[in-house]
């Protein structure tokens, strides 16, 4: 019997409320026994939980791995997807293509086949997911190894696993592929750039002093300062001191905790750019905060997709051996 064709954006999987896309839905259909002709079914081996989401879950569970696993299983059982009800964010998965719908196989330019190893480039917050079993939880890198299945829709983005790097390395890089691809569009030659959450001049801000030597060794930072990004005055004073008292042209905030918006805005001069690439970012805090201090800055919310973002991100690792080594040591 021929497979039924679903909506290219996956709205046929929305259970409630009707009329929304899968990301905005409270609950989606994760029944893997019925597959549509324009869907891809994947055997999932790992989930990379969004950093803000994993931090919130871990804090709520007191860091207890068993409770973290139970909470993740509970979210997926209730909602049909891994979407943190507090942060609204998800993550992405690594897996193997198990089934491709009839219509997708006929689609011009379609480049997948059963057995291909892939990384999803769309959020788990919109991806139907079924978890059979949690195998292990890696709290230090926000990763959960599982036995499970996921559905990718016709419109979904994905990347084949590269052959020249390990799977954990590729997964870690592709998890935030939109950030480097977009960030490279923003600075101009001679700009002063402030990066918050760094885990002309490029200054990184971290909370842990132990991270400073490794970051400086990369050769991409002019300076790395130690400050708490939830304390904007502290960050501003340290950041300006590192830049000879001058305000910055661009700041990039990739911190995975709340209330860091003003630390990104305060050190930037009028007409400067502030780029938020964190699911912990609050539009209200950023907009009203900038208004309250009279800062005329352009604020950009990071989009997880930019054309060729997966290739750009992997090439960054290929071209920077020190950065690749840092990723290898942390994620592999």
Regions picked out by a protein language model, each given a short descriptive name:
Residues 33-48, 59-124:
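Glycine-rich beta-strand-centered segment in the early N-terminal region that forms part
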Residues 91, 118-192:
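NAD(P)H dinucleotide-binding glycine-rich loop of Rossmann-like/cofactor-binding domains
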Residues 101, 122-124, 128, 197, ...:
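Conserved "cap/hinge" positions at secondary-structure junctions
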Residues 165-225:
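Mid-domain Rossmann-like dinucleotide-binding core that forms the NAD(H)/NADP(H) cofactor-binding site
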Residues 183-189, 244-245, 266-267:
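Glycine-rich helix-loop-beta junction characteristic of Rossmann-like nucleotide cofactor-binding loops
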Residues 200-259:
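Adenosine-nucleotide cofactor-binding segment
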Residues 245, 315-332:
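C-terminal capping/lid region of NAD(P)-dependent oxidoreductase domains
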Residues 255-320:
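Glycine-rich phosphate-binding loop and adjacent beta-alpha segment
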């Amino acid at each position: 019997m021929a497979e039924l064709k679903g909506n290219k954006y996956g709205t046929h999987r929305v259970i409630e409320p009707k009329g929304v896309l899968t990301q905005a839905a409270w609950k989606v259909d994760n029944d893997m026994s019925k597959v549509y002709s324009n869907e891809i079914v994947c055997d999932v081996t790992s989930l990379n939980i969004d950093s803000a989401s994993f931090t919130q879950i871990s804090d709520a569970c007191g860091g207890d791995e068993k409770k973290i696993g139970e909470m993740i299983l509970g979210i997926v059982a209730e909602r049909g997807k891994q979407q943190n009800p507090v942060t609204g964010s998800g993550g992405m998965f690594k897996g193997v293509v198990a089934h491709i719908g009839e219509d997708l196989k006929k689609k011009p330019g379609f480049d997948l086949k059963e057995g291909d190893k892939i990384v999803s480039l769309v959020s788990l917050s919109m991806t139907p997911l079924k978890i059979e079993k949690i195998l292990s939880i890696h709290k230090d890198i926000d990763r959960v190894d599982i036995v499970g299945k996921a559905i990718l829709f016709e419109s979904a983005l994905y990347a084949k696993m590269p052959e020249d790097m390990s799977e954990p390395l590729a997964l870690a890089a592709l998890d935030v592929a939109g950030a480097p691809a977009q960030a490279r569009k923003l600075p101009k030659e001679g700009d002063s750039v402030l990066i918050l959450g760094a885990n002309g001049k490029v200054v990184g801000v971290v909370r842990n002093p132990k991270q400073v030597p490794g970051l400086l060794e990369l050769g991409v930072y002019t300076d790395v300062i130690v400050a708490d990004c939830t304390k904007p005055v502290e960050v501003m004073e340290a950041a300006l001191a590192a830049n000879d008292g001058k305000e910055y042209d661009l700041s990039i905030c990739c911190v995975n905790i709340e209330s860091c918006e003003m630390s990104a805005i305060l050190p930037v001069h009028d007409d400067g750019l502030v780029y938020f690439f964190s699911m912990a970012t609050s539009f209200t805090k950023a907009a009203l905060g900038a208004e309250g201090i009279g800062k005329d800055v352009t604020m950009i919310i990071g989009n997880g997709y930019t054309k060729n973002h997966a290739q750009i991100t992997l090439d960054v690792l290929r071209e920077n051996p020190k950065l690749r080594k840092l990723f290898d040591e942390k994620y592999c």
